[in-house]
Amino acid sequence: MVRYKATISYDGTLFSGFQRQPNARSIQEEIEKTLLRLNSGTPVTVHGAGRTDAGVHAYGQVIHFDLPQERDPEKLRFGLDTQCPDDIDIVSIELVSEEFHARYSKHIKTYEFLVDAGRPKNPMMRNYAIHYPYPLSLALMQEAAMELVGTHDFTGFTASGTSVENKVRTITQASVSIDEKTGFYVFAFSGNGFLYKQVRNMVGTLLKIGNGRMPVSQVKTVLESRDRNLAGPTVAGNGLYLKEIRYE
């Protein structure tokens, strides 16, 4: 078998998430259906680097799959891209060794989260950013975001019900900025892995800090206490983007 690595992007609005689910539309299923046609009716399993949730978007999701023979990567990319639905784009495909695994090979993920703050809101962006109508302090959020950088136990920023036992992760970069063109707040996080709804919980906490309803020290309090109840709310997934995955 020959292994292929593909970088894909997608608009997550009409998907239940990346992972295949019964009676629901998923990115994995759509790509597997297309590969089934390209592979003469033989099923192909797609493995993703990240299992994005319903409504979450991606610019740089990475997948891998195996085919029984070697094909020209660009021709394969073109065939897969043109036969996938319009809300999925196959950015690139390359041949990789059998040891490569999209999820388990060592990598750094970067997520971005967009917030349309203030009034009036932009209804055209309702599927691509969350609206937050209250005043925000960029300086306070930037200061609090720096507290997330480093290796920590992120239990307090994880959604309940996760089956992952080891909740220690390393965040190498965390920032908050304002996009000059849109005026949206951009929350960016890079790290070696993220827990279930971790990014959305961190953004919810930073928004409360930016609005003055939590102190900057709340981030440290949540990390040390590992108490989810002390963090901010889970923001909606439509503002979240899997921006990039870099492999070592």
Swiss-Prot record:
InterPro entries noted in UniProt: PsdUridine_synth_cat_dom_sf, PsdUridine_synth_TruA, PsdUridine_synth_TruA_a/b_dom, PsdUridine_synth_TruA_C, TruA/RsuA/RluB/E/F_N
PANTHER family: PSEUDOURIDYLATE SYNTHASE (PTHR11142), TRNA PSEUDOURIDINE SYNTHASE-LIKE 1 (PTHR11142:SF0)
Stated name of the protein: tRNA pseudouridine synthase A
Family that this chain belongs to: Belongs to the tRNA pseudouridine synthase TruA family.
Species for this entry: Streptococcus thermophilus (strain ATCC BAA-250 / LMG 18311)
Gene behind this protein: truA
Pfam families to which the protein is assigned, alphabetical: PseudoU_synth_1 (PF01416)
Subunit structure of this chain's protein: Homodimer.
NCBIfam families for this protein: hisT_truA
Alphabetical UniProt keywords: Isomerase, tRNA processing
Catalytic-site annotation from UniProt: D53
CDD domains for the chain: PseudoU_synth_EcTruA
Gene Ontology MF terms: RNA binding; tRNA pseudouridine(38-40) synthase activity
